[in-house]
Amino acid sequence: MSSKKYELDAAAFEDKPESHSDAEMTPQKPQRRQSVLSKAVSEHDERATGPATDLLPPSKGLTTEEAEELLKKYGRNELPEKKTPSWLIYVRGLWGPMPAALWIAIIIEFALENWPDGAILFAIQIANATIGWYETIKAGDAVAALKNSLKPTATVYRDSKWQQIDAAVLVPGDLVKLASGSAVPADCSINEGVIDVDEAALTGESLPVTMGPEHMPKMGSNVVRGEVEGTVQYTGSLTFFGKTAALLQSVESDLGNIHVILRRVMFSLCAISFMLCMCCFIYLLARFYETFRHALQFAVVVLVVSIPIALEIVVTTTLAVGSKHLSKHKIIVTKLSAIEMMSGVNMLCSDKTGTLTLNKMEIQEQCFTFEEGNDLKSTLVLAALAAKWREPPRDALDTMVLGAADLDECDNYQQLNFVPFDPTTKRTAATLVDRRSGEKFDVTKGAPHVILQMVYNQDEINDEVVDIIDSLAARGVRCLSVAKTDQQGRWHMAGILTFLDPPRPDTKDTIRRSKEYGVDVKMITGDHLLIAKEMCRMLDLDPNILTADKLPQIKDANDLPEDLGEKYGDMMLSVGGFAQVFPEHKFMIVETLRQRGYTCAMTGDGVNDAPALKRADVGIAVHGATDAARAAADMVLTEPGLSVVVEAMLVSREVFQRMLSFLTYRISATLQLVCFFFIACFSLTPKAYGSVDPHFQFFHLPVLMFMLITLLNDGCLMTIGYDHVIPSERPQKWNLPVVFVSASILAAVACGSSLMLLWIGLEGYSSQYYENSWFHRLGLAQLPQGKLVTMMYLKISISDFLTLFSSRTGGHFFFYMPPSPILFCGAIISLLVSTMAASFWHKSRPDNVLTEGLAWGQTNAEKLLPLWVWIYCIVWWFVQDVVKVLAHICMDAVDLFGCVSDASGSGPIKPYSDDMKVNGFEPVKKPAEKSTEKALNSSVSSASHKALEGLREDTHSPIEEASPVNVYVSRDQK
């Protein structure tokens, strides 16, 4: 038997807790609580079913001129969207903690009439804002490109002809065609005729609704059967989509976590730098009797250089590069900060249909036959004979059967009569004659218990068939019975076919990988409890499932209690998923998990998912999601399946690692600079070593050298977004105390080595101490003042770049992971520029500080001074790296600031206990024994029979999945 499976769109079979009636747009459900969408639904339906005078009469089409006038009046048929003006983005780049500090420095420099220095600072400020603006605009353009590529179209009658146009330019009064397979482009009234409309994306109900002139198909729904002409009544913000978008604004979005982290880092570094610089300022005035002007200039320059001016630019660039990388994995990021949040996700709430499953119904090779000679192939042929096999399928069930059967074999029979599906009889029937033998017979297919009532040997096979139906129902399997008459006209049960929407081939492995990466997966579905249990079994998820009636009942989804996590968190964590839930339950589940301390991602596709998507830390609109879901989501998938989400997590963790290494480096560089000049100002002063230059009583660098360090470092750091990283195996969580400790260790070694070199240089510069200095021991001439300044500039510059390579590998040695070529080349170029500048600096007095190139000199030893500085820096770089690794080992050993225990986010998941019993929920503690299986089957028998009765009427059943058993079982084999 071939292992081939036959596919069918599973959306037509998806089950939800309740269904529409043909006459109601939004039926009342006694257990359903008012959701954040209910207000929009009720208002829209009151308007749609109100007096006829409220609606436009049936349209006969518009002209282009009329449509243009109406477009000016009503606006474009698009969801309302808030867009920040480009100029405002640029202005925001000129304000904030970092820009504000730089503005203060610029004002002070100009006030002191230091025009060149002020101009340099001003240029840095403008460059900072421009690059930040460019990266933000570029990221926004990527999102806009996605929206443009997904723009829906509409078939409209304009200028006396039918044409395809952008649905965004539809206006009230347009005549549109609503046909099977097309989306409803706006809120429309039906001129005449009847269509079946799928409103699952709007209401969460999967059963199609039959609509006529008294109904109004809504924008965002889909026509599944029929074709009519309709009149556009409402567009844009006046549609149900527009109402939903307005309601979503009530769910406030948290400020991106990365911005909170950056602000904390900025304020911490600014506070430290400001405090130390103020101490230097006061000390210089009191100790060296420096003028207010000179002391203030020194303090301001050190402050500006020490604070991370380009912090937001580098982070924005890194996130933008990450968004481009994600787009290659079929993931579009609508909010850059979502990448950082995604790296910390440790709880994923996933839809079932289409995400965990293929969303394609498949005939399985598990077939139960009741007569010798029958098998899956012959049963499928009989099922196809009970349909018009050479005509387009009449419904989803026929599509599946005809796609699986051998239609060439069916052509050996002539269909004399065909009775289509009748809701009363729950089956189809046909009379046929075999062209080869002339035998005449009847066939039928339908709900198993209906067919069972027809067969002549019902008493003989009744228990067997009921056991089969019950066992399949208990596993969430859908089934279809086929029967045939013999020469005496008696009905014989030919077989029972099984079909399901199976998991995607990679879903089970993807869930396993997710758990290995520290992410727990919860399935959230509106489907039947049995389906959810079977799906969890197939995917190795916890079979304990909560249904809607076991969840806490919340009256107002906009006013959730703050103790949900405390009361219900452990209960929700102890199950594998949730079944038969409504949109407001999804919202509540996400909020409970967030209160429990988890970073939660949520997948969804419909308008009803939008509030939960917005509430989640990371909302993910899956492939084929509605515009409303995309608008509420942080990420949009352009490829189906859960594996895409896992790829998003890994890429996001890579981005997080880049940001972590950058922040560690940036904090280290700031502490190194400010602490070096602070300590040098107090203890290692040229005045103490015999300096008589009034402008060289304490050690400092000219502003030009400071700015050169800043520009070269920031320019190189722009490439960190392209650096090689290895994603963490655990969810990433910002632990700023650990980051500051790691950065402080790097800074302490770099600062200590700089202070030591300054001490060596001052002794080599001093006439009093030269004889005992290292310069004298190495055979070097006494160090001039200008070369001392330039030497320290080169040392600080080299140490900064080497610290970058140490910070990027965390607790490993710097050679653990090679840098990317672009980062390496950027660092080499910057180091080369710094070395060349220090070597051949023209002897001058910028800011009255004497400077001189290190390579200028009479002897070869003097000309090789830059090389000696390089050797010194490299030796201390190795020391720095060893100290870093040892420090990380000690930090991990003592779990400093929870660097180990808090790595995965919210701690271990508690196993189920009796204390978790809420609303009667009890877990599946072990598989049922055979002695209890029959009782379980009988408990679901009546429910499964009732569901199977409606199999053909609504092309739906609450029994959906089956285990992939590729066998067929005959009665004799049993």
Swiss-Prot record:
<feature type="topological domain" description="Cytoplasmic">
    <location>
        <begin position="1"/>
        <end position="92"/>
    </location>
</feature>
<keyword id="KW-0547">Nucleotide-binding</keyword>
<dbReference type="InterPro" id="IPR023214">
    <property type="entry name" value="HAD_sf"/>
</dbReference>
<dbReference type="GO" id="GO:0120029">
    <property type="term" value="P:proton export across plasma membrane"/>
</dbReference>
<feature type="topological domain" description="Cytoplasmic">
    <location>
        <begin position="322"/>
        <end position="630"/>
    </location>
</feature>
<feature type="transmembrane region" description="Helical; Name=6">
    <location>
        <begin position="662"/>
        <end position="684"/>
    </location>
</feature>
<feature type="transmembrane region" description="Helical; Name=4">
    <location>
        <begin position="295"/>
        <end position="321"/>
    </location>
</feature>
<dbReference type="GO" id="GO:0008553">
    <property type="term" value="F:P-type proton-exporting transporter activity"/>
</dbReference>
<keyword id="KW-0597">Phosphoprotein</keyword>
<dbReference type="Pfam" id="PF00690">
    <property type="entry name" value="Cation_ATPase_N"/>
</dbReference>
<feature type="topological domain" description="Extracellular">
    <location>
        <begin position="713"/>
        <end position="737"/>
    </location>
</feature>
<feature type="transmembrane region" description="Helical; Name=7">
    <location>
        <begin position="698"/>
        <end position="712"/>
    </location>
</feature>
<keyword id="KW-0460">Magnesium</keyword>
<dbReference type="InterPro" id="IPR008250">
    <property type="entry name" value="ATPase_P-typ_transduc_dom_A_sf"/>
</dbReference>
<feature type="active site" description="4-aspartylphosphate intermediate">
    <location>
        <position position="351"/>
    </location>
</feature>
<keyword id="KW-0813">Transport</keyword>
<feature type="compositionally biased region" description="Basic and acidic residues">
    <location>
        <begin position="950"/>
        <end position="959"/>
    </location>
</feature>
<feature type="topological domain" description="Cytoplasmic">
    <location>
        <begin position="888"/>
        <end position="974"/>
    </location>
</feature>
<feature type="binding site">
    <location>
        <position position="605"/>
    </location>
    <ligand>
        <name>Mg(2+)</name>
    </ligand>
</feature>
<dbReference type="InterPro" id="IPR023298">
    <property type="entry name" value="ATPase_P-typ_TM_dom_sf"/>
</dbReference>
<keyword id="KW-0479">Metal-binding</keyword>
<dbReference type="InterPro" id="IPR018303">
    <property type="entry name" value="ATPase_P-typ_P_site"/>
</dbReference>
<dbReference type="InterPro" id="IPR044492">
    <property type="entry name" value="P_typ_ATPase_HD_dom"/>
</dbReference>
<keyword id="KW-0406">Ion transport</keyword>
<dbReference type="InterPro" id="IPR006534">
    <property type="entry name" value="P-type_ATPase_IIIA"/>
</dbReference>
<feature type="transmembrane region" description="Helical; Name=10">
    <location>
        <begin position="869"/>
        <end position="887"/>
    </location>
</feature>
<dbReference type="InterPro" id="IPR001757">
    <property type="entry name" value="P_typ_ATPase"/>
</dbReference>
<comment type="similarity">
    <text>Belongs to the cation transport ATPase (P-type) (TC 3.A.3) family. Type IIIA subfamily.</text>
</comment>
<feature type="region of interest" description="Disordered">
    <location>
        <begin position="950"/>
        <end position="974"/>
    </location>
</feature>
<feature type="transmembrane region" description="Helical; Name=3">
    <location>
        <begin position="265"/>
        <end position="286"/>
    </location>
</feature>
<feature type="topological domain" description="Extracellular">
    <location>
        <begin position="113"/>
        <end position="117"/>
    </location>
</feature>
<dbReference type="Pfam" id="PF00702">
    <property type="entry name" value="Hydrolase"/>
</dbReference>
<dbReference type="InterPro" id="IPR036412">
    <property type="entry name" value="HAD-like_sf"/>
</dbReference>
<dbReference type="GO" id="GO:0016887">
    <property type="term" value="F:ATP hydrolysis activity"/>
</dbReference>
<keyword id="KW-1133">Transmembrane helix</keyword>
<feature type="topological domain" description="Extracellular">
    <location>
        <begin position="652"/>
        <end position="661"/>
    </location>
</feature>
<dbReference type="InterPro" id="IPR023299">
    <property type="entry name" value="ATPase_P-typ_cyto_dom_N"/>
</dbReference>
<keyword id="KW-0812">Transmembrane</keyword>
<feature type="topological domain" description="Cytoplasmic">
    <location>
        <begin position="138"/>
        <end position="264"/>
    </location>
</feature>
<feature type="transmembrane region" description="Helical; Name=1">
    <location>
        <begin position="93"/>
        <end position="112"/>
    </location>
</feature>
<feature type="transmembrane region" description="Helical; Name=8">
    <location>
        <begin position="738"/>
        <end position="761"/>
    </location>
</feature>
<feature type="transmembrane region" description="Helical; Name=5">
    <location>
        <begin position="631"/>
        <end position="651"/>
    </location>
</feature>
